[in-house]
Amino acid sequence: MIVNGVELSKRDAVSSTLGVFEGLELYTGGADCLTNTYRIEGLYLTPAVTAVDLDGMEVTPVATSGSSLTFFHRGEPETEAQMRSVAESFFSAYMDYSAHAFEYTRFSNLLSRILPQSDLYQYVQRSQEAMYWASGTQTEYTDLRYENFHRISDYCFVCTVIYSADMTAKNWYEQYSYKLENAYELSFVSTNGRWLAAGMNVITGA
């Protein structure tokens, strides 16, 4: 990766993780899917920080948190046209499930869109008890964007979902409102002719 003209190699990374590609080696093929974290001294957010990967492809920051920048590959129009409906369908099911008290139809609809052997599938399965309390929260999404569609292989793609939401939480003695702004990095894989969500990482500070 090259940031403001300074070339950084994997040896310069302070940490590396597979993130949303954990356990998906069967689908990513030989692609390098590591998320690398670098620490750079004397780098300021103004003027704008620019970066390209070592193949010369420009990457763009989609989230900032304190002194951290999170970069993703820019979207590919062909991939976006093919995969947007997949991402929208999954995230719509996720929003529908997470904004209500536990209800089996919403629960099974969401699980049907997730790779069964993934950590994401296990996470949703374990969420049942917590979701009984979701009826006390009203969620209104004021901004919802699907961006940075990038094909990893013939069987895997990644994108980001950026959103703002007005939340109103209620319990038996009070009501309070707050605004939530976040982004998710999502990975999807193709299995038996169907695209399924396989990874979902929150990106704070979007």
Language-model regions: role of each:
Residues 43-77:
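Structured interaction patches on ligand/partner-binding surfaces of diverse proteins
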Residues 1-35, 67-87:
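Amphipathic alpha-helical assembly segments used for oligomerization, scaffolding, or translocation
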Residues 20-23, 27, 60-63, 110-119:
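Short, charge-rich amphipathic segments
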Residues 140-152:
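Short amphipathic beta-strand and strand-loop transition segments with alternating hydrophobic
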Residues 1, 74-140:
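Core segments of small alpha/beta cavity-forming domains
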Residues 21-55:
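Short Pro-Gly-centered beta-turn/loop motif in secreted/extracellular proteins
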Residues 1-12, 16-19, 30-32, 150-206:
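Exposed beta-sheet edge and beta->alpha loop/turn motif
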